[in-house]
């Protein structure tokens, strides 16, 4: 299949950025630029039973695979369509039992290898960019990253050798490096992790901290919509990262994961940085050094919490959140993004513990500064309104709930498109209350 391209868009060489995607026609806010079916994808283990493994539909009463009892499907059709991928894991899951634990990256990479064998020619996901062309940044990997790739390769051999042939080690290193910087995480309307996937044409877009498009998902289909007006000849930019944080933090993240430093307007002017690291107005203002120390503390505690999530109890996690907020509040305003980060984590722990009132209190403190720090149409803001709306509804605050859900819908109609199933579901929630 020859690359027939995408209507109104072209691949081009973006100065200083390598390949990129450029508009050939105007797009208005909310317009769908293109959609891209997943080249390969995998449902995350924690969502098994909630979503169909094949089409990612979320519903009650899915049927389970009779062999492994681990995969769930809408019906026989979905199960049959998924078999070429599921068979890579079906009997190994039974054989390994409790010891079956490949990472999601390994699971996705196994599926890419299977797909390449089944479908060596170009796919409808690769109209402008083929998987083979993905950037790997091999020359930029440090030893730690190389070691991580080698352990992924070992796991790939360990769990998948019965049903898959592998290329040599060097080719696998390249493939894992490509997956690491071109893979996507699929999230639901509340930004909960659903799975991982490869969307080659979506991966063609370069990054900006003031993006003009947003990527959302409809099952295993990625959709790209304009969140700013785009004129013919303009490059199409998405954001690779969470845009909450100040410039230095964003670029640390971009360098670490994607090996470049951003030079967008936001990174050049740093316009939002002052508000993002808002300092308390005290009669004796904190010294520059005290501020620097507190920023360093904040970054460390964020990393500490990220690691602690894997082994600490909810109450211990909540304590980290509360103590760190207390410490930071001596220097930082509540609207400071480091404070917001810990509030957001605390809210997540409250939701996990089903402490709805606690979660609501955190959400109420978060939403206003979120709306200020994030771009106009932001999935982070939409999902926060949605969580708030559902909490209000659950706690019988109907008027506040409806108002919050409508705020979520207003953003989602642009980001997800007016006809997205998520929007119908939320409207249904408003109706039924």
UniProtKB/Swiss-Prot annotation:
CDD domains: SET_SMYD2. Changing residue 190 to K: Strongly reduces methyltransferase activity on p53/TP53. One of its GO terms (molecular function) is histone H3 methyltransferase activity. Zn(2+) 1 binds at residues 52, 55, 74, 78. It holds the Pfam family SET. Induction: Expression is repressed by CEBPA. Residues 7-241 form the SET domain. Keywords: Chromatin regulator, Cytoplasm, Metal-binding, Methyltransferase, Nucleus, Phosphoprotein, S-adenosyl-L-methionine, Transcription, Transcription regulation, Transferase, Zinc, Zinc-finger. InterPro entries: H3K4_H4K5_MeTrfase (IPR050869), SET_dom (IPR001214), SET_dom_sf (IPR046341), SMYD2_SET (IPR044419), TPR-like_helical_dom_sf (IPR011990), Znf_MYND (IPR002893). Interacts with RNA polymerase II and HELZ. Interacts with SIN3A and HDAC1. Interacts (via MYND-type zinc finger) with EPB41L3. Interacts (via SET domain) with p53/TP53. Interacts with RB1 and HSP90AA1. This is N-lysine methyltransferase SMYD2. The lineage of its organism: Eukaryota, Metazoa, Chordata, Craniata, Vertebrata.
């Amino acid at each position: 299949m020859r690359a027939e391209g995408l209507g109104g868009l072209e691949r081009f060489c973006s100065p200083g950025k390598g390949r990129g995607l450029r508009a050939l026609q105007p797009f208005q806010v909310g317009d769908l630029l293109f959609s891209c079916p997943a080249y390969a994808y995998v449902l995350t283990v924690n969502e098994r039973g909630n979503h169909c493994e094949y089409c990612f539909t979320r519903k009650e009463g899915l049927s389970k695979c009779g062999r492994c009892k681990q995969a769930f499907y809408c019906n026989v059709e979905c199960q049959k369509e998924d078999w070429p991928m599921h068979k890579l894991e079906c009997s190994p899951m039974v054989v390994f039992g409790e010891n079956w634990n490949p990472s999601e990256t390994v699971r996705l990479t196994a599926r890419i290898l299977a797909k390449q064998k089944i479908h060596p020619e170009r796919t409808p996901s690769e109209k402008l960019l083929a998987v083979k062309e993905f950037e790997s940044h091999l020359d930029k990997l440090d030893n730690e990253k190389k070691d991580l790739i080698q352990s992924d390769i070992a796991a790939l051999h360990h769990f998948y050798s019965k049903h898959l042939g592998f290329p040599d080690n060097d080719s696998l290193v390249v493939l894992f490096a490509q997956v690491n910087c071109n893979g996507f995480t699929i999230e639901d309307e509340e930004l909960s992790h659903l799975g991982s996937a490869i969307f080659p044409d979506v991966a063609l877009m370069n990054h900006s901290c003031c993006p003009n498009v947003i990527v959302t998902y409809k099952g295993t289909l990625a959709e790209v919509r304009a969140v700013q007006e785009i004129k013919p000849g303009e490059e199409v930019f998405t954001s690779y990262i969470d845009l909450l944080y100040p410039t230095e933090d964003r670029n640390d993240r971009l360098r670490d994961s994607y090996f470049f430093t951003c030079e967008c307007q936001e990174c050049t002017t740093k316009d939002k940085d002052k508000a993002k690291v808002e300092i308390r107005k005290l009669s004796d203002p904190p010294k520059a050094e005290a501020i620097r120390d507190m920023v360093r503390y904040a970054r460390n505690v964020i990393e500490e919490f990220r690691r602690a999530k894997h082994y600490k109890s909810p109450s211990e996690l909540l304590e980290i959140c509360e103590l760190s907020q207390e410490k930071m509040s001596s220097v930082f305003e509540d609207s400071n993004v480091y404070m917001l980060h810990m509030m957001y984590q605390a809210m997540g722990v409250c939701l996990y513990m089903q402490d709805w009132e606690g979660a609501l209190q955190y959400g109420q403190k978060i939403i206003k500064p979120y709306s200020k720090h994030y771009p106009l149409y932001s999935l982070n803001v939409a999902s926060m309104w949605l969580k708030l709306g559902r909490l209000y509804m659950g706690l019988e605050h109907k008027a506040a709930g409806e108002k919050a859900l409508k705020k979520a819908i207003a953003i989602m109609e642009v980001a997800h498109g007016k006809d997205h199933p998520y929007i119908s579901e939320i409207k249904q929630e408003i109706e039924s209350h």
